Amino acid sequence: MFERLEVMRKTYYALQEKLASGISDVKEITKLMKELKSLEDAVVAYEKYLSLKEQLKDLEELLELETESSVLEMAKAEEKSLESDIENLEESLRILLLPKDPDDDKNVIIEIKGAAGGDEGNIFAGDLFKMYSKYAESMGWKVTLVNTTPGSSGGFAGIEFIISGENAFSYLKHESGVHRVQRVPETESQGRIHTSTAVVLALPEQEDIEYDVKWEDIRFDTYNSSGAGGQSVNTTYSAVRLTHIPTNVVVTSQEERSQHANKDRAYKLLVTRIYDKIQQEQLEKEGESRKALIGRGNRSEKIRTYNYPQNRVTDHRIGLTINRLDAIMEGRIDLIIEPLINEIQKEALEGQSK
């Protein structure tokens, strides 16, 4: 591990020198900056580790020479504290050296669809959208709507949006799956608890992929943007539908005001969907081990239950139950995301040690 960290540190400073040498090529600068950033956390942690090891060495030398009992007592307490800090830092370094998901630093495209439960499923899809929006706001990220299909009684039959921000996908990629809600609908006169579901899909936004997406392979259609009940909300054909004929991937964008902006947004979405389709086909070939490795899991599995009467949320993947549903629906999904990421990292570390 430490040989690898030493190589990373040397590479990090070599990149800094190269950037300081006055490179004018913007693409080259961007590439170097990205590489530098990918090394930064590990290098900073490693240098802190080296500093603590040096402090511990000096302290041990002091303990060998010191005879004053009060000083010895203080030094031994500090030695114990340093050893604990070093042990914790070693664990952090092992995590930082785990294989990285190459998409972690990307923006995330989230699609939510009301599923079982009809109107109540759609209303819950709307609640999930608000939850993710508030979480994004707390992280300083931007939310951009791509498509909305309003539900007849509120919420959304379907909604698609992009969350843009540093490492957004790394935090939200584990949200894909079936989200189940248990509560009494407003229209329920007998006070009975109903169970409904919404399905979430989280994808990394792709700017470019190895697969060659050519405009001549894309069918381009325009139509009127529509609001609730299918009513037209403008008289221009600003909404865009793109169909990639070789893969039969279809995307739409209607939330931008101009056709040009919707076309740009739809193209990015199309590239992302094609990338995802290719990746899913590859995962099927490689089997479940690869799925587990990147931690994205089965999109059809029930991942979480939101129980309103008991103010309880349970994430079934790690057996985590939190009695703070009200806070979570107000955007505090970090209460679930952080333990989930920690558990995934723990499993990855255990896998490496086998």
UniProtKB/Swiss-Prot annotation:
Q: Where are the transmembrane segments?
A: none
Q: Gene name?
A: prfA
GO molecular function terms attached to this record: translation release factor activity, codon specific
Q: What does this protein do?
A: Peptide chain release factor 1 directs the termination of translation in response to the peptide chain termination codons UAG and UAA.
Alphabetized UniProt keyword annotations: Cytoplasm, Methylation, Protein biosynthesis
Q: What Pfam families is this protein classified in?
A: PCRF (PF03462), RF-1 (PF00472)
Entry protein name: Peptide chain release factor 1
InterPro entries, per database record: PCRF, Pep_chain_release_fac_I, Pep_chain_release_fac_I_sf, Prokaryotic/Mito_RF, RF-1
Q: Which Gene3D superfamilies match?
A: 3.30.160.20, 3.30.70.1660, 6.10.140.1950
